[in-house]
Amino acid sequence: MHFFSVSDRRYCFDEVTRNCFQVDQASEDALRIFEASGRTVNSKLLTKSLAAKGYDQTTIAELEDDIDEYQRLSERTFLTKDTPRKLRSIELHVSHACNLGCSYCFAGKGDYGTSPLLMTDEIAFKAVDYLVASSSENETLAIVFFGGEPMINEPLIWKTVDYSKRIYPNRNFTYSITTNGTLLNDTAVNSFKEHGFSVLISLDGTGCKHDASRPYKTGGGSFSDIDKNVRRFSESFPFGARATLTNNNCNLVEDYLQFKEMGFRRIYFSPVSSFDENIKLDEHSLNKIRAGLIDLADQYLKQIDQGEKPLFRTLKTAVDLIMSNRIAFVGCGAGRRF
């Protein structure tokens, strides 16, 4: 069990039952005793432990009834074996090249430490063949285009989409791409619409904060071009923003409001993976991020209550798991179904 506070409210998340609920101090004390016993605490031990904490007999009797009911609930909850299933999605690195020189790029500024390379038609088509051959017959399959900057090899993207639909007309495919947003054009956006693409644009905050981390390799900032492209096309296409949080860029609410104003329909935040002292997240940055997450979580829940589709999506997977009472056996599907 995990106990935590939000504002002046106290909560318990039980990883066994996948329930999250508000608790008072007495309930928390009783649940901690229950958990510490291996969820096998008897009435005598519970009474003794609660009495030692100063609770009266009436309160103890109520807590005993609550724990007895919760114990029965826990016993009915089984962690089923996570049986590996067949492949469902594949990520195509269509370009090991990039026009940006991001300071912390895990891909070595796009080329992964080698000479810039573009994927060939043959490799892309073989990858689609492999995906189909390794999948369940009736399952929708996902093709993800990645890089480097995948739009540098834009012709291959459309060839791959055409190949998947033409060679496998009885299979359903979804398509997605993560791009830096600098190379968007009318033809590409129209094709995104036609084929139902999900498009994420990588950003590092807005304005000078973004430009400090994500300049062009030729020099100069890239944010103004991205901003122009998003505003131009967002009225007709639902772009998503994926913002990287660094030590110099950790004001979630400020960036969220700016991304919303630009026209993004989905907004995600992810922490930087770097040991660079100039950008890695320190305790001060993490505290700012926690505060921002709480503010955005409140907005997220308000939008759900009002029947709206939330823009802030960072917490969506976790909230969906809790609301559906499901459990994720692994944090990432790479090497399993992906």
Predicted regions, residues:
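Short glycine-enriched, charge-decorated loop/helix-capping segments at active-site entrances
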Residues: 111, 117-118, 212-220, 283-284
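A C-terminal junction/extension of Radical SAM enzymes
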Residues: 278-338
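Short acidic, hydrophobic short linear motifs in intrinsically disordered regions
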Residues: 38-51
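Accessory C-terminal segments flanking Radical SAM cores
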Residues: 1-29, 313-338
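Radical SAM/AdoMet-radical enzyme domain recognition
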Residues: 124-144, 153-274
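N-terminal [4Fe-4S]-dependent radical SAM core
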Residues: 2-22, 49-91
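Canonical Radical SAM [4Fe-4S] cluster-binding loop centered on the CxxxCxxC motif
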Residues: 84-85, 89-122
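Active-site neighborhood of divalent metal-dependent phosphoester/pyrophosphate hydrolases
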Residues: 147-148
